Curated annotation (Swiss-Prot):
Site entry: Increases basicity of active site His: D87
Protein name per its UniProtKB record: Hydroxypyruvate/pyruvate aldolase
Binding site for a divalent metal cation: E152, D178
Gene: PA50071_1
GO BP terms in the entry: phenylacetate catabolic process
Cofactor note: Shows a slight preference for Mn(2+).
Active site: residue positions: H48
Provenance organism: Pseudomonas aeruginosa
Length: 268
């Protein structure tokens, strides 16, 4: 059996833009439905959605037959948690709240086997190796790992150039929701000051030769980020899409205008 090729990483290197969807429903059936819609990548959120290791495993299994590539965001950049996520088959991670080059370097080590890193060796127990059915898994697994780091506060912005320069970081994702809050514009990522910071960050990431990514459910902003050269852009969130559709349907039959969404334009 051959090691699965990380097509998300391949396309990042080619410079081809990839369109994604954020998944927070934490359910394999819902994840498969989203995959069937045709997105290039699907973010399985372990930071703000009620996911655990088993629910993420189920979603990875549900997505496996589809071309859309799974990206997992863990709750934090914990080495032991990263080891577990890689063992269940994750090949691309988006790690939140990365503030320094030293932190990014530690994450690079966490996704690699020794001697290049510190990932624990337990491939006989791991879905990633198909329980040691993938030939030469230990010798080639590192090649398919894709590490995305999320910069989303003022410290991270200040250290962005150093973070993007870290070897082994494949892409840098700008987190508009937390960044706007850190800049004093909580809930308003469309504020001109926030947008100026985001556009500058995208330019700096691309200048460093790394892929830039972002999430925005605002179509105008999402298209703007693509024009600026973002390589991976999530353009919606499953919970927001479902909530909006349900409110609209209820409103049509029960009368009255649908209740407005309390979410920022980041999530829809």
């Amino acid at each position: 059996m051959d090691l699965p090729v990380n097509r998300f990483k391949q396309r990042l290197r080619s410079g081809e833009a990839q369109i994604g969807l954020w998944l927070g429903l934490a359910d394999p059936y819902c994840a498969e439905l989203a995959a069937n819609a045709g997105f290039d990548w699907l973010l399985l959120d372990g930071e703000h959605a009620p996911n655990d290791l088993r629910s993420l495993l189920g979603q990875l299994q549900a997505l496996a037959p589809y071309p859309g590539q799974p990206v997992i965001r863990p709750v934090q950049g914990d080495t032991a948690l990263i080891k577990q996520l890689l063992d269940i088959g994750a090949q691309t991670l988006l790690v939140p709240m990365v503030d320094s080059a030293a932190q990014a370097e530690g994450l690079v080590r966490a996704v690699r086997y020794p001697p290049a890193g510190v990932r624990g060796v337990g491939s006989a127990l791991a879905r990633a190796s198909r329980w040691n059915s993938v030939a030469e898994y230990l010798n080639h697994a590192d090649e398919q790992m894709c590490l995305l780091v999320q910069v989303e506060n003022l410290e991270g912005l200040a250290n962005l150039d150093a973070i993007a320069a870290v070897e082994g970081v494949d892409g840098v994702f700008i987190g508009p929701a937390d960044l706007s809050a850190a800049m004093g514009h909580r809930g308003n990522p469309g504020h001109p000051e926030v947008q100026a910071a985001i556009e500058d960050a995208i330019h700096r990431i691309r200048t460093a030769g790394k892929a830039a990514g972002i999430l925005s459910a605002d179509e105008t902003l999402a298209r703007r980020y693509l024009e600026l050269g973002c390589a991976f852009v999530a353009v919606g969130v499953d919970t927001s899409l479902l909530m909006r559709s349900l409110r609209e349907l209820a409103g049509r039959f029960k009368g009255g205008a649908p209740a407005p969404s309390a979410s920022s334009s980041v999530y829809g």
